[in-house]
């Protein structure tokens, strides 16, 4: 292994850089370090303080942002000092340790992106089996595997396959990519190419399914949005549907195209951020491994390294603030009642559990997982998330909703929307049924109950995807039948009414269903 003294002669030329270049590089790395630290710290604190946000998907996000936070605290400060002084002054031991730490954190971050892509794949394509495939234990095992996988990719330089040294153009200690082309190729494939392939495959399938669903909805339903003013001056969308195979309504084509663009943009942002931040760095180290150390311009080498650091800035933005629930809680923590109260008054706290939310939020809503989990638990304990089931009749068409409310907003939610929808939680319903039950009921086999429960929930999710594949938080308030399609609409409404089920209780595997009151 090489120390800082091994490259003293080489560093003499780098130290002679002109003043403006030195100042620009130093300012840039300082800004990058501050942004990485603040951005990831905000997401880590938000997820930690709001424990109900730590769904399985968000646990992966927490691990990702926490590792980036470590990078900003344990690695980048020394890069800043080296960039200013134009030399490494912290000794050989810390040089080797910081190089190993940088490679470990960077590798773990890239592999975590692949794990998140797999998580999204199951959440979007197989929502019914998601709680069984992605469990808490498996999530922990996945995170442990990520770090062990990364460690395997970073240890070879300590055992003689390549070396660790201070790079005078990257201004940090890192593996000597130009000395061992074999190790450079191994690290790129083991820690970067594998998660990239996983991301391409998973997000490709996600977009394909979203596009197919959008086409089916577009061909079978014409959506007309009518604006109706409310007392507070805001507008509420009312929707009327009719069966039609033609594109007579221009607005439906706009909605169809916009929804596809919405999913496509989300996926492109995820893939594009990975390629743009890590792509140049991979090209630089590959060129060094094949053609030698001086084959790349020092300026390009520095820029590529700095650009790879910016991936840690993108992660909290894409996987944290892009999530509506996390963003809401973050703003609530920053502005308190000035933001939280208007938010609950202007936006519905119940929203459709749709494919749109699963794709664009990039974090699975914990409510379906909690809903499924409650069906198999023998002990009914209240959680931090008040997950309930309700039926809404506000537009003439009953729609199954999964309540998206936290404990501090439950009471306000019931007051505001008591006239529009009825909501009942699992815990309250279980207590009511226990008090009111005077006649013994015939027991139902747990396997049959779970099958019926899964079938009804699958039908509801299927109807949600067909009605509102990329719906907004506020579901349209009116559904009107267009002239000339009354028979078809009547059949559609009758079919929807068959799906109006309300989970009454879950106790010892006994699941009962009944129609919601219209």
UniProtKB/Swiss-Prot annotation:
A GO term, aspect molecular function: G protein-coupled receptor activity
Keyword Transmembrane helix: yes
Compartment(s) of residence: Cell projection, Cilium membrane; Cell membrane
Membrane topology designation: Multi-pass membrane protein
GO CC term (a single one): recycling endosome
Region of interest: Disordered: 429-448
Biological process (GO), any one: negative regulation of smoothened signaling pathway involved in dorsal/ventral neural tube patterning
Source domain of life: Eukaryota
Extracellular membrane side: 1-26, 81-97, 160-185, 286-301
InterPro entries: GPCR_Rhodpsn, GPCR_Rhodpsn_7TM
Disulfide bonds: 95-173
PANTHER family associated with the record: G PROTEIN-COUPLED RECEPTOR, G-PROTEIN COUPLED RECEPTOR 161
Record's function text: Key negative regulator of Shh signaling during neural tube development. Recruited to primary cilia and acts as a regulator of the PKA-dependent basal repression machinery in Shh signaling by increasing cAMP levels, leading to promote the PKA-dependent processing of gli3 into gli3r and repress the Shh signaling. In presence of shh, it is removed from primary cilia, preventing its activity and allowing activation of the Shh signaling.
Similarity-based family: Belongs to the G-protein coupled receptor 1 family.
Name under which the protein is recorded: G-protein coupled receptor 161
Organism: Xenopus tropicalis
């Amino acid at each position: 292994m090489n120390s800082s003294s091994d490259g003293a002669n080489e560093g003499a030329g780098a130290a002679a850089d002109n003043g403006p270049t030195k100042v620009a590089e130093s300012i840039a790395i300082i800004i990058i370090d501050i942004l990485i630290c603040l951005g990831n710290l905000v997401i880590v604190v938000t997820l930690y303080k709001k424990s109900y946000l730590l769904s399985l998907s968000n646990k992966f996000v927490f691990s990702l942002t926490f590792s980036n936070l470590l990078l900003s605290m344990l690695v980048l400060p020394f890069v800043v000092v080296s960039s200013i002084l134009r030399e490494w002054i912290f000794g050989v031991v810390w040089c080797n340790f910081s190089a190993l730490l940088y490679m470990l954190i960077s590798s773990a971050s890239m592999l975590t992106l692949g794990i998140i892509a797999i998580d999204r794949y199951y959440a979007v394509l197989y929502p019914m089996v998601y709680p069984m495939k992605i469990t808490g234990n498996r999530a922990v095992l996945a995170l442990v595997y990520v770090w062990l996988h990364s460690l395997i990719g970073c240890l070879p330089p300590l055992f003689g396959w390549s070396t660790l040294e201070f790079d005078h153009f990257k201004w940090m200690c890192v593996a000597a990519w130009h000395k061992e082309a074999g190790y450079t190729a191994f690290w790129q494939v083991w820690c970067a190419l594998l998660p990239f392939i996983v991301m391409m495959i998973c997000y490709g399938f996600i977009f394909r399914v979203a596009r197919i669903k959008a086409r089916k909805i577009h061909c079978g339903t014409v959506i007309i949005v009518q604006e109706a003013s409310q007392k507070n001056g805001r507008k509420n969308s009312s929707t009327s549907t009719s069966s039609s195979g033609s594109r007579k309504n221009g607005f439906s084509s706009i909605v169809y195209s916009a929804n596809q663009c919405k999913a496509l943009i989300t996926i492109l942002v995820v893939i594009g951020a990975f390629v743009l931040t890590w792509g140049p760095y991979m090209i630089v180290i590959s060129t060094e491994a094949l053609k030698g150390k001086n084959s790349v311009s020092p300026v390009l080498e520095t820029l590529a390294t700095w650009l790879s650091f910016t991936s840690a800035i993108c992660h909290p933005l894409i996987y944290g603030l892009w999530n509506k629930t996390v963003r809401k809680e973050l703003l609530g923590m920053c502005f308190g009642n000035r933001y939280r109260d208007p938010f609950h008054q202007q936006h519905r706290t119940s929203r459709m559990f749709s494919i749109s939310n699963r794709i664009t939020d990039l974090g699975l809503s914990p409510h379906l997982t909690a809903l499924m989990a409650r069906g198999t638990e023998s002990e009914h304990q209240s959680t931090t998330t008040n997950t309930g089931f309700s039926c809404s009749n506000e537009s003439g068409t009953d729609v199954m909703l999964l309540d998206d409310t936290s404990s501090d907003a439950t009471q306000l939610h019931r007051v505001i929307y008591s006239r529009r929808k009825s909501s009942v939680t699992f815990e309250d319903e279980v207590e009511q049924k226990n008090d009111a039950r005077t006649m013994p009921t015939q027991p139902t086999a747990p396997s049959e109950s779970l099958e019926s429960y899964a079938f009804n929930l699958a039908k509801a999710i299927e109807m949600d995807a067909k009605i509102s594949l990329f719906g907004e938080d506020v579901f349209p308030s009116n559904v009107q039948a267009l002239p000339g399609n009354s028979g078809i609409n009547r059949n559609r409404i009758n079919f929807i009414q068959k799906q109006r089920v309300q989970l009454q209780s879950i106790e010892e595997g006994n699941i009962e269903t009944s129609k919601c009151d219209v």
